[in-house]
């Protein structure tokens, strides 16, 4: 019997909606990354993108444990000399709440073209509204 290998053109991708309200950031991100990679499917193949599309709602209401709300710091570099910027978790949630979940999930995906393709299937929104109703997403309880 030959080993099964998924082909990119035969992969069936579903759309799911996930509510992030009250969920712990890291635990949510690991499950999202797992589903973006397709590891929950029997036909998972490491070199083929077999994952599903995920819509995350209420990103502004995601939870963190301990003192991370004030102590966790996000850094980014502007490209200029002395241009390293930092923001706490609280500031990131106030300014761009979607980015917090995106950063957490992106770090858990493979680095390279395949990882970037997987990351493009993640859609994160701060509120409860999204513009993917035409895809008829199913509710996913994580």
Curated annotation (Swiss-Prot):
Database matches in InterPro entries: Ribosomal_uL13, Ribosomal_uL13_bac-type, Ribosomal_uL13_CS, Ribosomal_uL13_sf
Keyword Kinase recorded: no
Gene Ontology CC, one term: cytosolic large ribosomal subunit
Annotated keywords: Ribonucleoprotein, Ribosomal protein
The organism's place on the tree of life at top rank: Bacteria
GO molecular function: mRNA binding; structural constituent of ribosome
GO BP of this protein: negative regulation of translation; translation
CDD domains in alphabetical order: Ribosomal_L13 (cd00392)
Family per record: Belongs to the universal ribosomal protein uL13 family.
Biological function: This protein is one of the early assembly proteins of the 50S ribosomal subunit, although it is not seen to bind rRNA by itself. It is important during the early stages of 50S assembly.
Record-linked HAMAP family: Ribosomal_uL13 (MF_01366)
Subunit field text: Part of the 50S ribosomal subunit.
Protein name: Large ribosomal subunit protein uL13
Originating species: Sodalis glossinidius (strain morsitans)
Lineage, broadest ranks: Bacteria, Pseudomonadati, Pseudomonadota, Gammaproteobacteria, Enterobacterales
UniProt gene name: rplM
